[in-house]
């Protein structure tokens, strides 16, 4: 399982197989019910409009299909410059931007705010969001059995299976005591 945080992917350059700079990652689009990532939002590089036949755009934004990519310092996609049209995804609705989750309050089923979403964990083998980093509220750290550091207040361990709904906040299906011991300090 190749886990990466959204912060690792954000602004990463996307390069075609013939070394053309396609653009940079701006977001990840996921299906709310299944947490499956459907596409990567890209801010296109200068000159990409000509390649895609949309020369009126200076820096087009579009989405790329999910695939098997080599991801290290850059994201290398298998398509060459003249094949980029095949990699594009039309916006068919039904997906949400993952970055909308960052900063949302996390509330337990017993209506206690435990913190805010700080980052998103994505399994790159299955292209599924499966966990979150949470900036913990000072008052609930002890109840969650988390010893916060002086500087670091972010923990890992909130799974998508703990979430009942996402509205103005992230609503959990678990109470505070059910979450005790699930988190590890980053």
Whereabouts are the PLM-identified features?
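Peripheral interaction segments used for macromolecular assembly
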Residues: 1-186
């Amino acid at each position: 399982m190749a886990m990466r945080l959204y912060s690792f992917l954000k602004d990463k350059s996307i390069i075609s197989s013939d070394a053309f700079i396609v653009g940079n990652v701006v977001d990840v689009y996921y299906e709310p019910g299944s947490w499956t990532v459907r596409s990567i939002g890209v801010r296109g590089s200068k000159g990409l409009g000509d390649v895609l036949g949309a020369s009126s755009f200076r820096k087009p934004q579009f989405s790329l299909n999910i695939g098997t990519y080599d991801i290290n310092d850059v994201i290398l996609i298998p398509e060459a410059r003249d094949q980029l049209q095949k990699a594009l995804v039309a916006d068919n609705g039904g997906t949400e931007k993952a970055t909308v989750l960052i900063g949302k309050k996390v509330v337990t089923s017993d209506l206690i705010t435990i913190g805010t979403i700080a980052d998103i964990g994505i399994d790159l083998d299955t292209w599924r969001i499966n966990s979150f980093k949470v900036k913990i509220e000072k008052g609930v750290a002890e109840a969650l059995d988390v010893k916060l550091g002086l500087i670091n207040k972010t923990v890992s361990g909130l799974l998508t299976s703990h979430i009942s709904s996402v509205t103005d906040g992230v609503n959990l299906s678990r109470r505070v005591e059910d979450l005790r011991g699930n988190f590890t300090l980053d």
